[in-house]
Amino acid sequence: MSERIQNVQPKEWNGTKYRSTLEAETAQTLTALGIPFEYESRKITLQDGFRSPFQKDKVRALTYKPDFIIGSIMLECKGFETPEWKIKKKLIFKYLMENEPDVIFHQTHDAKKSLLEALDGHWAYLGYCIEVSPKPKKKGSVSCNHVTTQKYDSIQEAMAALHLKGKALGPILNSLIGEREYVYGYKWSLLKIKM
């Protein structure tokens, strides 16, 4: 086992003990965004156990327990990829393609940017609402004055209603205090509002 993995410290948050600080921070971010999730609620058998003529003991089954289940999304938190994990990930992909083709697998390396990028594009399915502003007048500027009070069920619906064109990117969390305020920047990415 990798020394880096051995040094991962469990952390408790909101009454649940998580296997790492990254997992706890991910749970905090999802909770702050109001995204319902299940933590380590499933176990998948990637390869059944078997007996081998080359060793006395039975070879144990190879299993995988996703860190988070969010609707049809499996979310894995990995700060560092070990060689063992890289092999296991390939088996996870194979299992999902053959057994659960509708399930989406994502891996995140942090509880902020890569997490939100992993969830990008699934808002309509998850049924969340967003607030969107028109394009700022000055390139790169963000103005809170133009945030609409109308809520939309998807980024695409909001863009159509406001006659916005361009590629919509994922939402950025305003703060970890339960607020949900989003705004479009000049590149049509959703930028963090500084309060």
Which residue ranges define each predicted feature?
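Active-site activation/catalytic loop segments of kinase-like enzymes and analogous catalytic loops
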Residues: 178
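Electrostatic, structured charged patches in enzyme active sites and in nucleic-acid/phosphate-binding
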Residues: 1-138, 150-157, 170, 183-195
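Short, basic interhelical loop/turn and adjoining N-cap
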Residues: 160-174
